Each structure stands twice: as C-alpha cells, then as structure tokens.
Amino acid sequence: MHAQRVARDLISGSPDEILGKILSFLPTHHAATTSVLSKRWRNLLPLVDKLELTEDHPSGRCSLGFPDFVEKTLALLDRPCSVIKKVHLNCDHLHGESRFYSWIRTVLERGVLDFHLESSRMYRVETEFFTSNTLVELTISGALYPEGELPPGGLFFPALKRLSIVLVAFADCDMYDDFVLGCPVLEELILYYADDDQPPGWNGKVSSPSIKRLTISHDYPDYPETHIYVWFDTPSLVYLDYSGHVARRYTAEMGSLEEARLNLLPWEQLIDSDEEDDDFDGYGPRWEKRSKDATGLIAMISNVKTLHLSSDSLEVIHSLCKVMPAFQNLLKLSFESDKERGWQVVPLLLNSSPNLETLVIKGLVHKVTSRCGDACLCIRKKTRGECCLLTCQVKVLKIIGYRGTCREQKQMSHFLANLKCLETVKVRVEVDHREDNDASNTYLRITNALMKLPRVSSNCRIHFL
C-alpha cells in the first residue's frame, strides 16, 4: 500500500505539462475519464497535444454518445491554455452533415497543425469554409465529397506542407485542381485511389510549382477511360512513387527529379512477339501495345539518380516502351523479380546506365523467356554475344530473398564472374524456420556455397545481412 501511495503521489506531484504529455499517450476517450478524479485533473485535458476522436464500435452498433463526446472534447480547443496540435476525427456513422461540418470548422479555426479527417459514410464538405492559416499536415480519407465555392482568395491552406487524399470524390476536376493549387507551399502530396467499390476520383493531373514528393496509387482496371492521359506539372519534384495501370500518354515537367519508384501494371497479360500466334482477332495484348505507351513516362524520369521498378514494370517497359532513354545520372537501380515476369528489359536498362554503381535485386527467380538477354542464364551460352555485365560499372550488388536454389546459385555465379568492378556483395538469405527443422545448417550451407563461387573482381567481398 505504501509503495502504491508513493507512486500515486509521484504522478500527482508532477507538473501539469508533464501530466499533459502522459495523457497524450492515452486514447482520448481514456484520457477524458481522468477528469472525474479531481478538479485538477479536470483542467489537465486541455494540455494534451493530440485528440483521437474515432468511432471504433462494431459495425451496426451506432455510438449514440459519440457526438456529445466529440463536442465536449472539441470545446477544449477554446481554452486559452490549449496546446492541442493534432486531431484525428473518424466517423463510422451518420450524425448529420451540419453537426459533422461544425466539428470540422471548430478544428480548423483553432490553430491545429495536423488534421486527419476520415469517414466511411458520405459527408459533403463545404469548401468555402474548408480553410486554415495554421494547418501544416492534412489527411482526408473515405466517403467525403468536397463541393461549393472557393475560399476568399482561392487559398485553402496557405501553410500546408503535406496533403494526403485517400478515396475522396471531388465534385469535379476543377475542384480537385483548385484544391491542390490552393495550397501554395505544399511539399508532399499523396493520392490513393485503388478501390473498385468507389469510382475514380483523380483526373490524371498534378500541377504544383512547390511539390517535392509525390506518391500516387491509381488502380482502376474497370475504368480504362481514367488512364488515358497523365500529366505532371511539378518542376520542383525530387521524389516520385507511382503505381497504376499504364496510360496511353504521359506528359511531365519534372526537371528536378532524383528518385523514382514505379509499379506499372498491364491491362492484359503481355505476350512476347515470338510467342504470339496467327490466330489474332484484333484484341488482347497486341491491341494493348498499340493503345498504351510507357515511352513518355520512362523518358521523363531518365534524369533520376535512383530508380526502383516492380516486376510488372519490367515487363511493361519491355513491351510498351518504344525507345529506351539514356540514364546518364542513374547511380542506383533496384527491381523486383517474380516467377511469372521476365527480365527481358534488364540488359537494355544496364546498357543505358553507364554510371550505375549499385544494383539491388529482390529475388533472383524470374520467368524464363528466349529474350532475357545476357543479364541472366536463361539462354544457352553459345548463343550469347558479349555479356552486358562486362561493361557494367556496378560496385555494389545487393540480393534480397536469396534461398540458395540451384538456379539462384548459377545466377549469382554469373554476376560474380562478369561484374569486373564489383567491390561489395550484400546478400539477405531467406530460410523458412517454420518448415525447415534444420534452419541453422541450411543457412550455413547456403552461405558457404556462395562464398566458394569464383569472382572476376579481386576486390569483391561478400557480406550477409
């Protein structure tokens, strides 16, 4: 009892600012219950720096007390001593649009810096008053529908640096454009539209002179008309993460781009020309090759220093890129492998990257085709010309997910025997501890076999991650 009383006194004797920080680590509805302890604790809740106002009740059980809880908690923002800077508001039930919007206005008018607004039910958001001079980070997610007039001066959030838009349906394309342009100092934009249950909400355009980081996930296979034209007018962009089905045409202004991460998805299964037959009815893969074109996208990222490609991207670039540009500035290339996707474009990528220093490959097993070139061992040695690896300047090779199979070992042998400038090889061995009862010995067998492979570079050292 004495120890408990001392601990209780230590907490109660702490300064209000410390207690406010402690309460900030608790869910808001738990922190709010401390107000019944004493008058002092009742005055501590305004000292928390974040509010989590979320409905986490099981589906079908409407939280009748949630609106009252939200309104009483948001009233804390009116206190002069309030230090609340971050608010997460998530509504799973309908509580009336006027009430919902009054909550939003309260948050925006009280100097909050970070606002996460989320709803699984459709709510209209009046854009004329959807504005804040202090907000730095904003996430709007779910069934929200911004519509109405622009704020005075056309500025929504003059201080906003980071904006995340997740499955939000704007009233029209102009409203979306105005919303982004209404954030004049925006540095990072995240657009996520990948849910067939809702129609696409992105018009394929991003225009902002200030954006430095752009992440887009746009995956609507049932809406090909939304993938016709993609336009990036982002002269300050340094980082691009783009995932979506390949479009018909790309246009961009991205002269500052340094790093790109691409996950280009095909509309149909792509077929090599040497695998096509004469029974062609005018539709399918060859029709896709005529109607979709990744050339513009690849050309506009050709100045990057770092490039990451998914396994789908490898095949899309091979089949739907008419001209491979020179990647003169590329220092690091990484790509993923898949047993259903080929490496046909890898030799061309390596030959187009004369200054490449680091090569990262996630998985060595890929689809065997007659057109994989000489970056791998898919074709017989006697039919190969000079290996593209011989002229490659790669100094660091990193392999992730190495399982030590016969095919993987042959591929590693091919790399080590041809990469003349190689200095460091980093390998992350993958052993299934659940299925392998002798995982430790399996790991040693894999690593020992790899260490015994001959190396053309006398400076090459192998490290295991």
Curated annotation (Swiss-Prot):
InterPro entries: F-box-like_dom_sf, F-box_AtFBL13-like, F-box_dom, FBD, FBL60-like, LRR_FXL15/At3g58940/PEG3-like. Residues 8-54 form the F-box domain. SUPFAM superfamilies: F-box domain, RNI-like. It holds the Pfam family LRR_At5g56370. CDD domains: F-box_AtFBL13-like. PANTHER family: F-BOX DOMAIN-CONTAINING PROTEIN, RNI-LIKE SUPERFAMILY PROTEIN. This is Putative F-box protein At1g21990. It comes from Arabidopsis thaliana (Mouse-ear cress).
